[in-house]
Regions:
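Context-gated lysine
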Residues: 2, 10, 20-22, 48-51, ...
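Generic structural signal of hydrophobic/aromatic residues within well-ordered alpha-helices
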Residues: 1, 5, 56, 60, ...
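Acidic-enriched, low-complexity/disordered segments with a strong bias for Aspartate over Glutamate
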Residues: 33-38, 43, 54, 70, ...
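Short N-terminal edge-element motif at the start of the domain
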Residues: 1-67
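ADP-ribosyltransferase catalytic core
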Residues: 59-98
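A eukaryote-biased signal for long
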Residues: 90-166
Length: 166
């Protein structure tokens, strides 16, 4: 794997990510650049993953990065149901988008036909009147969300299995 370059790193603070998929755990980190864009630890071809949180901590120490100890968790082994945890669905959608952008691959959720459902999930998170954590959404939106997550494997395969980064 090529050396990870932290181009335009806004500061030395990075954030930890835990992805659970196919009963395996993968840790990585992300950071923001000066323009507010977020990047996973990558070398433009692969995203650097670690088997344990301690390995992530060690990597950050070796690279003089301040690791925020809060861990963003994404469990892709949990099947979506309706009523849906709209916050979890939106967060998973966003991390899949970030992975795809970092690896320059297609993520189905970025297609125009999904803009309306993404905006709906986003509005549930920031509704004026707070919604319950599990919220029954219209079936037309739920079917589109399921379609996006049924096609997540290509993005996760590229992240976790297409290289020797673990």
């Amino acid at each position: 794997m090529k050396q990870i370059l932290f181009n335009s790193l806004k500061n030395e603070e990075v954030f930890s990510v835990l992805i659970k998929w196919k009963n395996n755990l993968y840790y990585t980190g992300y950071y923001y650049d000066e323009d507010g864009n977020d990047y996973l630890f990558n070398d433009l071809e692969n995203i650097k993953c670690f088997k344990t949180f301690d390995e992530l901590v060690s990597f950050c120490g070796q690279n003089n990065l301040l690791l925020n100890k809060d861990v963003s968790k994404y469990d892709f082994d949990i099947m979506l149901t309706n009523p849906i945890d709209y916050s979890d669905a939106l967060n998973k959608w966003n991390i899949l988008n970030t992975i795809s952008l970092n690896l320059n691959i297609v993520f189905e959720g970025n297609e125009n036909k999904y803009t309306e459902v993404y905006n709906y999930l986003f509005s549930c998170n920031f509704a004026i009147e707070q919604l319950p954590p599990l919220y029954k959404i219209p079936n037309k939106y739920f079917k589109l969300i399921i379609s996006v997550f049924n096609n997540q494997n290509e993005v996760l395969d590229k992240l976790l299995y297409s290289n020797d980064n673990i």
